[in-house]
Curated annotation (Swiss-Prot):
The keyword Cytoplasm does not apply. It holds the Pfam family Fe_hyd_lg_C. The keyword Metal-binding applies. It comes from the Eukaryota. This is Cytosolic Fe-S cluster assembly factor NAR1.
Length: 650
């Protein structure tokens, strides 16, 4: 099992092997009665525990067992763990393994496909499987590698899985993808961004920059270690949160099914999504059910399909025929494309909205921070006035995430009460670098004015200076390096088998894991990765159990047959200081028009209809349907002694 780095890095018992022993004692909030006397604990032959009074009752001088009371067994569930900062690898990792392909197989066995007339009380639950596009891309890459065939297009693979699982003997599943839910999440993110921006422009206290919250690993880290930054997190539900609400609240109502009469499963690229599904905001106390009953990782879905006998290369009728509206198989448009990143395109959606709403033409300028494609800044510049109207960033991986936390704390003042002595020196160094850039920029401009194309370079160089002073407006944050396509639950690359069988590691899903467990194999100068050896040349920390080549392959398949996102800018002479100017107008850039049908516009209309059907004009219902809340976790271990995670010295 592979949690994101943001989850495991914050805990003191990070190197302990998984254990069922929780380090936090179970609290008993029940107050003893005032007239209670001394008691003893008795254990019977069946290992049941009883509390027995040592005072004999009237008329029972020799019988002290008449007042015994059965004791309830103390239990710790996933909700308790999410509200505790004591550990994460030792308890939650065991509890979330209960959500696996074995649970789905058991459900298929016990859930009748038709109503039993002799058992009218036992109504079968309607099974729904929602698959993320990152999962489909990873499965396609794995199937192509195993069979030496071309990758299966995502739409074709989705429909083959749907046709297979819809068979009665396989469970009669409804199989969807999650891109329409992502579309609704992106729309809500734009609405929330405007709300915050309007508050800021009116001079009110606004929680800026807005930080994307679709990554549960980042959210869990923020709640447990960076609680002061929670107001900055976007309240918009992730695609999983919204598809869960759609399945239980909207689709179930259309079919006259109560929420507890639907069994909803999602297939996601990471284990952390299991934690997200267990949050209290996604639980209905009225029906005692969650929006998502079980979360499978990509690897677990693959194991499930294997056990059921799925052959991904068996074609079905009309598998490649595009659909432009909701069908009987899927009530939502299939596999919507959102230009930007394979991790949800949250930043790109905000950028497009800013460009459309700005009165003048704009250009996008990008810069890789320290040459990393996982840490890129985006500036939107007014081409007429030269003003920087927006500054955003894409931040993937825990190392970059920590730098982001420090940067945001510096810009906003959040969580800076405990600044160390070195903070002032760092600020002075940053200020000196900015002064140097400002004085050097005019010289660079005048020295290159005669060269062809240097007007663009000069603008980019000057924009770098003004961009340094501009504060962040929005950040797309993901805990995994490479984003969601490199999630811990994705399919893993095939590697050479070592000669000694005992040298091969096997993870919980049964996959062989010969790669070093704390790095990514990177070929050097075209050489081999030396997989299976004790060391790997050019190993990059963070991309656990994967390689850059494999992640790039999954990324490529993700966009196969879809509009390709803008490539990361190369560091060339025409790309001064790592900036790549891209001139854009205010026209729509990410619309999908097929046979005269704008799929995104069509999806916008469907989203509005669904929200109105579920919420009506009730703003409170709409908020609960589309958004969520975050809660700062007060540490039972560290904070009780006045020590924070950041103050711990290793």
């Amino acid at each position: 099992m592979a949690f994101s780095g943001a989850l495991t890095i914050t805990d003191l018992d990070d190197f302990l092997t998984p254990s069922q022993a929780c380090i936090i004692p179970v609290r008993n909030n029940k107050k003893p009665a005032e007239d209670e006397g001394p008691t003893e604990i008795h254990i019977d032959s069946n290992n049941n525990y009883y509390e027995v009074s040592t005072y004999p009752s009237v008329g029972h001088d020799d019988d002290i067992g008449n007042s015994k009371k059965a004791l309830e067994k103390a239990e710790i569930n996933l909700n308790d763990c999410l509200a505790c900062s004591g550990c994460i690898t030792s308890t939650e990792s065991l509890l979330i393994t209960m959500q696996s392909q074995n649970e789905i197989l058991e459900f298929i066995k016990t859930n009748p496909t038709v109503v039993d007339p002799e058992s009218p009380c036992h109504k079968p639950r309607l099974p729904i499987l929602s698959i993320s596009p990152q999962t489909l891309a990873s499965l396609s890459a794995a199937y192509a590698t195993a069979s030496s065939r071309p990758p299966i297009p995502l739409l074709v693979l989705l429909r083959r899985i749907r046709a297979f699982l819809s068979q009665p003997e396989k469970g009669s599943w409804r199989v969807w993808d999650t891109t329409f839910a992502r579309h609704m999440s992106l729309r809500e993110s734009v609405v929330e961004f405007h709300e915050r921006k309007d508050k800021k422009e009116k001079g009110k206290a606004a929680e800026m920059p807005m930080l994307a919250s679709a990554c549960p690993g980042w959210v869990c880290y923020a709640e447990k270690a960076q609680g002061d930054m929670l107001p900055l997190l976007s309240a918009a539900r992730s695609s999983q949160g919204i598809i869960g609400a759609l399945a239980k609240s909207w689709y179930g109502h259309k079919l006259q099914h109560k929420p507890d009469e639907i069994y909803h499963v999602t297939a996601m690229p990471c284990y952390d999504k299991k934690l997200e599904a267990s949050r209290s905001d996604f639980y209905s106390s009225l029906y005692s059910t969650r929006d998502v009953d079980c979360v499978l990782t990509t690897g677990e879905l693959d194991l499930l399909l294997q056990e059921l006998g799925f052959d991904p290369h068996v074609p079905i009728a009309n598998e490649s025929t595009p659909s432009y509206s909701a069908t009987e198989d899927s009530p939502f448009p299939e596999l919507l494309t959102h230009e930007g990143s394979s991790s949800g395109s949250y930043l790109q959606t905000i950028i497009h909205d800013v460009q459309r709403s700005h009165p003048n033409p704009t250009r996008i300028i990008t810069r890789e921070i320290r040459g990393s494609t996982d840490n890129i800044e985006y500036l939107i510049q007014d081409t007429i006035t030269g003003q920087i109207v927006f500054k955003g960033a894409k931040v993937y991986g825990f190392r970059n995430l920590q730098n982001l936390v420090r940067k945001v704390a510096k810009e906003t003042g959040i969580g800076r009460s405990g600044r160390g002595a070195g903070a002032g020196k760092l600020s002075a160094a940053v200020a000196a670098r900015r002064r140097k850039a400002k004085t050097a920029a005019p010289a660079a401009t005048s020295a290159t004015t005669s060269a062809e194309g240097t007007d663009v370079e000069s603008i980019a160089s000057l924009s770098l200076v003004s961009g340094e002073d501009k504060k962040l407006d929005f950040v797309e944050v993901m805990a995994c390096p490479g984003g969601c396509v490199n999630g811990g639950g994705q399919m893993k690359p095939t590697v050479p088998t070592p000669s000694a069988p005992e040298a091969m590691e096997v993870d919980e899903e049964g996959y062989q894991r010969p790669l070093p467990d704390d790095g990514v194999a990177v070929a050097v100068n075209g050489g081999s990765n030396n997989v299976g050896t004790g060391t790997v040349a050019g190993m990059e920390e963070g991309m656990r159990w994967s390689t850059k080549e494999w992640v790039a392959k999954v990324e490529d398949i993700y966009w196969t047959g879809l509009p390709t996102p803008p490539a990361s800018p190369p560091l060339t002479a025409s790309n001064v200081n790592g900036f790549a100017p891209q001139v854009k107008t205010n026209g729509t850039t990410n619309g999908q028009v097929n046979n005269g049908v704008d799929r995104n516009l069509q999806s916008d209309q469907l989203a509005e209809e669904i929200i109105h059907e579920v919420c009506g004009d009730d703003a409170s219902k709409r908020w609960d349907f589309m958004r969520t809340r975050f809660r700062k976790v007060e540490s039972d271990v560290l904070s009780s002694g006045g020590v924070t995670h950041e103050a711990v010295k290793w």
